[in-house]
Amino acid sequence: MSYAIFKHGGKQYKVVEGDIVLLDKMNKEPKALVELVEVLAVSKEGKLSCGKPFVNGAKIEAEVINEGRSKKVITFKKRRRKDSKTKRGFRRDFTRVRITKIVA
């Protein structure tokens, strides 16, 4: 089974062909094709090739499924005996992609 590790938006993802991954928002239309070129490592047929920092000639092709926002995450801070509190919400914008091909 071949897999790849790539970097996008300051995070690293391990994927195989056919995986569905949530990436940071990319402002792409559904069905658009995306190339991810910051590939850190590729494993094909049990042979691992690591890059310094990226693997030369390696790329990952993906198809955009949709864009959306995650569920709201609430952060709440309360300072005891001070009658002071803070409530803040956060929703992450994401692009859902399907990995179609790993080229190494």
From Swiss-Prot:
Keywords: Ribonucleoprotein, Ribosomal protein, RNA-binding, rRNA-binding. The keyword Amino-acid biosynthesis does not apply. GO terms for molecular function: rRNA binding; structural constituent of ribosome. The keyword tRNA-binding does not apply. InterPro entries: bL21-like (IPR028909), bL21-like_sf (IPR036164), Ribosomal_bL21 (IPR001787), Ribosomal_bL21_CS (IPR018258). GO terms for biological process: translation. GO terms for cellular component: cytoplasm; ribonucleoprotein complex; ribosome. Signal peptide: none annotated. PANTHER family: 50S RIBOSOMAL PROTEIN L21, LARGE RIBOSOMAL SUBUNIT PROTEIN BL21M. Belongs to the bacterial ribosomal protein bL21 family. Part of the 50S ribosomal subunit. Contacts protein L20. HAMAP family: Ribosomal_bL21. This protein binds to 23S rRNA in the presence of protein L20. This is Large ribosomal subunit protein bL21. It comes from Helicobacter pylori (strain J99 / ATCC 700824). The gene is rplU.
